[in-house]
Amino acid sequence: MSAKEVKFGVDARDRMLRGVEILNNAVKVTLGPKGRNVVLDKSYGAPRITKDGVTVAKEIELEDKFENMGAQMVREVASKSADAAGDGTTTATVLAAAIVKEGAKSVAAGMNPMDLKRGIDLAVEAVVADLVRNSKKVTSNEEIAQVGTISSNGDTEIGKFLADAMKKVGNEGVITVEEAKSLETELEIVEGMQFDRGYISPYFVTNADKMRVEMEDAYVLINEKKLSQLNELLPLLEAVVQSGKPLVIIAEDVEGEALATLVVNRLRGGLKVAAVKAPGFGDRRKAMLQDIAILTGGQAISEDLGIKLENVTLAMLGRAKKVMIDKENTTIVSGAGKKADIEARVNQIKAQIEETTSDYDREKLQERLAKLAGGVAVIRVGGATEVEVKERKDRVDDAMHATRAAVEEGIVPGGGVALLRASEQLKRIKTANDDQKTGVEIVRKALSAPARQIAINAGEDGSIIVGKILEKEQYSYGFDSQTGEYVNLISKGIIDPTKVVRAAIQNAASVAALLITTEAMVAELPKKNAAAPAMPGGGMGGMDF
């Protein structure tokens, strides 16, 4: 075990505070509409330019072990805010640094760190309650666009794209952000349920120009096992031919005699048919097939349920207004499933999302939810250079998470004003002793830090701006740093999602309170490089001539 270095008390807190300050100074310059960019050097490829607080924070690693501990703890604040709300990472970092700085002074003055922490916790509870009380529900598409614009640093085009995407796929729909190959940013909506499996044989193609299978008002057979012989299916196929409707077969695989027979029938025109492999693997495949069954109003044919292929009737098949299959994807539009059944399935998946601890599982469940609930929107971000595309994609990601958060918990005035207004409520908090009161006061001072920093980044005097905002009692009155005017922020569209602001203060206070109560720090001593062994002497040792 290597030797350790231990620091105590003021010395430990000072070193830690220095690390917090370094990280905060790098991150805070990105805050607000007039925030600056940060350039990150990469070990390979071009440097990355970003205005995203958490991306900057994740790059910071300090040489001094004790300073680095402070920086890493605050980096955790940014990461947690990104996980919880997807935005507000810079605000959270600025708040944490402000609380740590004030808290360290109070501890140095001899106050009880545990009472300070209790005071901080009381203050945060009051702030969260105030935010929730003043939160305004998002009702219009315009407000969603405003949230997107603010979170993407004033880019109205991004705000508009996000509002359109949310309108088309609904609040539960999935919005994915990709890099485009062109200069333009574009939005593509995939309606209905799409999964990443294409046709098994190109002979099923109906539209030769686009190499695509297009079927209107089709039956859908959902089978969990492989199909290699068609004997069991003949009665069903005859019934489908009689109905004159096309048939889509989704199965683990279709091969051999079964595939050959289907292709021959398709080419002769007797049966309009196409076969697709089932999506996913293992238990996830079973779940996805069940989703398709519920969406199309059919039954998944599975031997687990005691249903055999020879007993399948037309009534057990799903129906869809349109099915499109290309080489890589299958899209089912307007399935005939009952609305109540689909809603029940959606609620079941939501419950699974709440319970799961795996990020991968959560992502897959959210994809399934979107496919059932609304559809998928893809925003392809364009730009002149790779560096520009990456920077813009960062902002679109932030804005996307912010718009979701706004729909979830509503909005409050932006520009750090919601926290400033909440700070006024803290004067009324009753505490058990003076040290707890100081803890509340630490948070009260820290709550002005984001508004102050936004003003500083816009080239204004932060203290004067904060003072003027607090003079007026109107809740949404604040400073528009883009134009340099005092306005009603909500009617001007300068708004923040309540969830983002709430997550920022909760995460900042949680980590900052722990840093304040730190009394000792332990870090590994740097290893001393052992001296290189001496080179052997010249000549041939041990040989006498």
UniProtKB/Swiss-Prot annotation:
Enzyme Commission number(s): 5.6.1.7
Catalyzed reactions per annotation: ATP + H2O + a folded polypeptide = ADP + phosphate + an unfolded polypeptide
Organism superkingdom: Bacteria
Top-level enzyme category: isomerase
Coiled-coil regions listed: none
Gene3D superfamilies membership: GroEL, GroEL-like equatorial domain, TCP-1-like chaperonin intermediate domain
Cellular component terms (Gene Ontology): cytoplasm
Record localization: Cytoplasm
UniProt: ATP binding residues: T30, L31, G32, P33, K51, D87, G88, T89, T90, T91, G415, D496
Pfam families in the cross-refs: Cpn60_TCP1
GO biological-process terms attached to the record: protein refolding
Main subcellular location of this protein, as a coarse class: cytoplasm
Keywords: ATP-binding, Chaperone, Cytoplasm, Isomerase, Nucleotide-binding
Gene Ontology terms for molecular function: ATP binding; ATP-dependent protein folding chaperone; isomerase activity; unfolded protein binding
Subunit structure: Forms a cylinder of 14 subunits composed of two heptameric rings stacked back-to-back. Interacts with the co-chaperonin GroES.
Function: Together with its co-chaperonin GroES, plays an essential role in assisting protein folding. The GroEL-GroES system forms a nano-cage that allows encapsulation of the non-native substrate proteins and provides a physical environment optimized to promote and accelerate protein folding.
Family in the record: Belongs to the chaperonin (HSP60) family.
Protein's UniProt name: Chaperonin GroEL 1
UniProt organism field: Nitrobacter hamburgensis (strain DSM 10229 / NCIMB 13809 / X14)
